[in-house]
A protein has these predicted regions:
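Transmembrane alpha-helices and adjacent helix-loop boundaries
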Residues: 1-425
Length: 425
């Protein structure tokens, strides 16, 4: 626990000094990472802690964004709600919409609940372009950040610190909620809702309240998005954003409180970096999600906790061989997959096909700093050899990891039993 607090303090300190060492473009990316982290953490209150998988949570993110923009235009950053407090309007919008939608959606559970949330979000996505007063039609609405508290909020650094403050406060409140009796009931709701009903609790009302609280914090994230971009349109209600928060949360780990924060931050950074390098970055995100679900169902945070437990038990030196083999194998295998996907993407692109029609020979493609001929055996043998080598190294890492687990000390249960007075050891 002490080490966890130290790591969190170091992380917070790093976030505070981050704008001083990053260029302006990267500060904007950092703001997006913070907003995505809060959105994922809000979603995990419903999914990971409450056991209710929603496929339409972007609706409450979007409602919070539009509500904040309307407040920005109406209040002009003055009065009781200056610019730094405008995300409260987003929270209110998300909470009210969450109460209304949650009342209907939580009438059912399981896959039926998920389909109802998806239907409600798609209904809003279809209606939004036609509701010009609320959502500005297809063009959306826009506003401007007004000065407040001696700050003009004209540069990305001030917006970053405002976003950081709201994200830290919101995540702290979400964690505090897990420690309350209501938070404990939320975990019990995930484990066995029927038992809660037999104990006399109103399960439907409990689900509605958890749904509304999750939507409220999603609305705060949407409000921060509105303050950052100063505009919004109906695309915020698109299914892609709802799917994105699901992927981020599960990749990070739904059973660890800060797991969604880790997953959202990493995947947002990956999206910003990879989208400038390749057209296939969404495919890589999907592959990563599939691999995590197949081989790391507890997510990246669960993997970190597992390795941390082994390090505390055995020390760094015992873990290094298996960790190095796993990282090396994953890196080589990833290189093979990227090589194959990028080669196929270039070969089947319209520009390459048009070039192929003008020339009977296969033109060379540029990849990893050199030219590769699609008709050459080496071009296709390279990813196969790299993939095979990566799989062999991963298999070695698996054997090393299993050997570590086999060396676990066996605890004698009789030795742990309290000894009766006069009993021989």
């Amino acid at each position: 626990m002490k080490l966890t607090k130290i790591l969190l303090a170091v992380l917070l300190l790093a976030l505070l000094v981050l704008p001083a060492i990053l260029p302006a473009a990267m500060v904007n990316a950092a703001i997006q990472m913070l907003i995505a982290a809060l959105f994922a953490c809000a979603f995990n209150l419903l999914c990971g802690q409450g056991g209710m998988l929603s496929f339409g949570h972007a609706a409450y993110f979007g409602v919070g964004s539009f509500a904040t923009l309307h407040a920005m235009s109406a209040l002009n950053g003055q009065g009781l709600l200056p610019t730094p407090l405008l995300p409260l309007i987003g929270a209110m919008g998300g909470f009210i919409c969450g109460l209304c939608a949650g009342w209907f959606a939580t009438k059912r559970a399981g896959v039926y609940f998920s389909m109802i949330t998806l239907a409600l979000a798609e209904l809003l996505h279809s209606l939004a372009p036609h509701l010009n007063t609320l959502f500005g039609g297809e063009a959306g609405i826009s506003s401007m950040r007004a000065p407040a508290w001696g700050l003009d909020f004209g540069d990305a650094t001030q917006v970053y610190y405002l976003t950081l403050g709201w994200v830290v406060l919101s995540i702290a409140l979400l964690y505090a909620f897990t420690l309350t009796p209501m938070g404990r009931l939320t975990f019990a709701l995930r484990e066995n809702g029927h038992r809660l009903q037999f104990l006399g609790y109103n399960v439907h009302r409990l689900r509605v309240l958890v749904f509304a609280l999750s939507a409220m914090f999603a609305g705060i994230a949407g409000g921060l998005q509105a303050l950052n971009l100063e505009s919004a349109n109906y695309v915020l209600f698109d299914m892609r954003f709802s799917a994105e928060v699901v992927l981020n949360t599960y990749i990070g780990g739904v059973n660890v409180f800060l797991g969604p924060v880790l997953g959202a931050a990493l995947m947002t950074f990956f999206g910003n970096a990879a989208s400038d390098l390749t057209q296939s970055w969404l495919l890589y995100q999907g592959l990563l999600f599939v691999l995590v679900m197949m081989f790391m169902p507890s997510g990246l945070a669960g993997l970190v906790l597992c390795w941390s437990a082994q390090i505390r038990r055995r020390g760094w030196l015992a873990i290094i061989p298996a960790a190095f083999s796993a990282l090396l194998g994953a890196g080589v295998l990833s290189l093979a997959v990227v090589f194959l996907i990028e080669t196929l993407q270039r070969v089947f692109s319209q520009d390459y096909q048009a070039l192929l029609m003008t020339d009977q020979a296969w033109p060379a493609i540029s990849l990893f700093g050199r030219e590769w001929l699609p008709g050459a055996l080496l071009t296709w043998a390279t990813p196969l050899l790299l993939g095979g080598a990566g799989l062999l190294v991963l298999k070695l890492a698996r054997h090393q990891w299993l050997r570590l687990l086999d060396d676990e000390p066996v605890v004698n249960a009789a030795a742990l039993r309290p000894r009766v007075e006069g009993e021989q050891p």
